[in-house]
Amino acid sequence: MQDITMEARLAELESRLAFQEITIEELNLTVTAHEMEMAKLRNHLRLLTEKLKASQPSNIASQAEETPPPHY
């Protein structure tokens, strides 16, 4: 009887391990896909930021254009 119980427990553990391996592989694929999507989104955000900066002139004057403070 002890052998049957041990064999049943071993079979259950092997089954759980197999399902865990499948789950880990699926999660790995999901994480990899998300990393690739995030890289694309970062690049897109960088390009949009550059376009926005290029299209809007700055309202802040450069140092050369600034008038000196009144105490000079």
From Swiss-Prot:
The record's annotation in Pfam families points to:
SlyX
Please give the residue ranges the record annotates as the region Disordered. Answer: 53-72
Q: Where is the composition biased (Polar residues)?
A: 55-65
- Top-rank taxon, per record: Bacteria
Family, similarity comment: Belongs to the SlyX family.
State the name under which the record lists this protein.
Protein SlyX
Species per Swiss-Prot/TrEMBL record: Salmonella typhi
Encoding gene per record: slyX
